[in-house]
């Protein structure tokens, strides 16, 4: 019992100083939902598109706090990947999205936890590695994109924290590229000429402070 109390007290003391660190490295993973237009997919039925929108996301980020104590201004970088896939009788889609961007953040630091708002503008690499009647078919588009994230973290020790992050990512495109049967062509977006696409992810992970 004395040992357990000692461990809890030690952990609490460590947690009190976790917010004093000026840099952090984070890794997260969790569910993700595709937002906006699904472009170039192999099946346009409502049920297929609804299932295709559900996927997974993961991210790695670095952040350096450059000013402030209770409210800290920070700069850093984010990589986020995501995957969405579904199959039907005559084909399949596997959408992969990779996003990289510099980040700026505002963090409210408390004794045992912190809340953070972050965002940035970067580049999103999109590829749908689909199949039609067993033949490979690729859809791709690489576009400027932006993200906005809200996260919360509870300090576990003086260096480690458990965190959750809600991240919204958005981009738009006028055309996308299709490659099928060794032929490649560009497809213009119908109607408005532009297409919004992106994702909303809720990820969970660990932060290392140093």
Regions found by a protein language model. Give the residues of each.
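Cleavable N-terminal export/targeting peptides
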Residues: 1-22
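Outer-membrane beta-barrel translocator domains and adjoining extracellular loop/strand segments
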Residues: 37-45, 84-93, 127-136, 175-183
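Short hydrophobic "helix-edge" motifs at membrane interfaces and signal-peptide entry regions
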Residues: 2, 147-148
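Short helix-capping and inter-helix turn/linker motifs at the boundaries of alpha-helical repeat units
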Residues: 50, 140-141
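A structural signal for short, well-ordered beta-strand segments
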Residues: 29, 119, 164-166
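Gram-negative (and chloroplast) outer-membrane scaffold detector with strong preference
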Residues: 61-133, 141-146, 154-160, 193-210
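Short glycine/proline- and aromatic-enriched beta-strand/turn motifs that initiate or cap beta-hairpins
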Residues: 15-72, 201-210
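Predominantly the C-terminal beta-signal and adjacent terminal strand-loop region
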Residues: 38, 48, 148-151, 156-210
């Amino acid at each position: 019992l004395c040992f357990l109390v000692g461990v809890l007290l030690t952990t609490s003391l460590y947690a009190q100083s976790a917010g004093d660190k000026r840099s952090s490295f984070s890794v997260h993973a969790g569910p993700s939902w595709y937002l906006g237009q699904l472009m170039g997919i192999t099946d346009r039925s409502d049920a297929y598109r609804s299932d295709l929108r559900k996927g997974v996301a993961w991210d790695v980020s670095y952040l350096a706090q450059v000013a402030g104590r209770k409210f800290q201004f920070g700069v850093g970088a984010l990589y986020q990947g995501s995957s969405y896939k579904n199959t039907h009788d005559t084909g399949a889609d596997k959408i992969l999205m990779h996003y990289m961007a510099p980040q700026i953040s505002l963090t409210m630091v408390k004794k045992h936890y912190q809340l953070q708002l972050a965002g940035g503008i970067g580049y999103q690499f999109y590829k749908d590695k689909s199949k039609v009647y067993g033949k490979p078919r690729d859809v791709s588009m690489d576009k400027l994109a932006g993200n906005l994230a809200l996260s919360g973290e509870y300090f576990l020790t003086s260096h480690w924290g458990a965190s959750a992050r809600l991240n919204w990512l958005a981009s738009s495109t006028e055309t996308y590229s299709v490659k099928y049967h060794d032929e490649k062509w560009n497809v213009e977006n119908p109607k408005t000429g532009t297409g919004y696409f992106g994702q909303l992810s809720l990820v969970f992970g660990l932060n290392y402070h140093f």
